Amino acid sequence: MGKTRSKVSVIGAGFTGATTAFLTAQKELADVVLVDIPQLENPTKGKALDMLEASPVQGFDAKITGTSNYEDTAGSDIVVITAGIARKPGMSRDDLVSTNEKIMRSVTREIVKYSPDCIIVVLTNPVDAMTYAVYKESGFPKERVIGQSGVLDTARFRTFVAEELNLSVKDVTGFVLGGHGDDMVPLVRYSYAGGIPLETLIPKDRLDAIVERTRKGGGEIVNLLGNGSAYYAPAASLTEMVEAILKDQRRVLPTIAYLEGEYGHEGIYLGVPTIIGGNGLEQIIELELTDYEKAQLSKSVESVKNVMKVLS
């Protein structure tokens, strides 16, 4: 019997989920199953068919299935969760947390039933708390439940730095710690352009402005769109994580991981530098932090814990 292709299921066929499915197929990383609720089964099938019809033009071989039936996800190597509601005007953060937690728990039960050996990558906001909810519901080891925010936040930081210096984004590296949101901690000391520390290339006031813009990166796009939120960069970030796992690349990526004493915190999911490979979370990298960075990280932890208090 010939070797079968890897299988990736994406739960939630909105803009981010559908774009993640397309990028994953386009890179020939795996066959893809795109899942949404029964009421949206036809649009989900339509998106999958549309992607499939792009394959002869783009020149990729991958099977893409749209469905509302979790049986179709059986035996997935990776399951990406983008399902959930966005915060609407007048909705409290607690309402958002409660609603999305219920969605996470029901989705996770289906994932565990049909793909008990998979690795789960969570994107749904508030992502630190939602990843924790999935971890608890799944009963999986922490290595197999991770969240995405740091790859995206770092990508935004790198984009703004490259614009500032008029350089290729490929030559800019960076790292963002902490929760996803206003309390994220971009580690400027560990950020470089062509191996040269950013602090030697960009004046402090400009660097501070870039850090602040990174923190507000999601909001900037929401304001410009007027309706909806970012999806190209979030989907590209998810795809980078999927590729690192399927190809066992052992990439150093900022990932939302479960802490057990690292950075002085435990029992919480938080964005930290990690090594991502075939087992999912291969290792958490502990960096030496300054007192200021530690204080910033603690503030970030408190924000995440405040959201987690709402979890059942």
UniProtKB/Swiss-Prot annotation:
Q: Which InterPro entries has this protein been placed in?
A: L-lactate/malate_DH (IPR001557), Lactate/malate_DH_C (IPR022383), Lactate/malate_DH_N (IPR001236), Lactate_DH/Glyco_Ohase_4_C (IPR015955), Malate_DH_type3 (IPR011275), NAD(P)-bd_dom_sf (IPR036291)
One example of the protein's molecular function in GO is: L-lactate dehydrogenase activity
Which Enzyme Commission numbers does its entry carry? 1.1.1.37
Q: Which residues form the active site?
A: H180 (proton acceptor)
**Record PTM Phosphoserine, positions in chain:** S149
Catalytic activity reported: (S)-malate + NAD(+) = oxaloacetate + NADH + H(+)
Question: Which residues bind NAD(+) per the record?
Answer: G12, A13, G14, F15, T16, G17, D36, N100, L123, T124, N125
Q: Name one GO biological process term.
A: lactate metabolic process
One Pfam family named in its UniProt record: Ldh_1_N
UniProt keywords (A-Z) are:
NAD, Oxidoreductase, Phosphoprotein, Tricarboxylic acid cycle
State the top-level EC class.
Answer: oxidoreductase
Q: Does the keyword Phosphoprotein apply?
A: yes
Q: Which family does it belong to?
A: Belongs to the LDH/MDH superfamily. MDH type 3 family.
Function (record text): Catalyzes the reversible oxidation of malate to oxaloacetate.
Q: What is this protein called?
A: Malate dehydrogenase
Q: Tell me the classification of the organism that encodes this protein.
A: Bacteria, Bacillati, Bacillota, Bacilli, Bacillales
What is the gene called? Answer: mdh
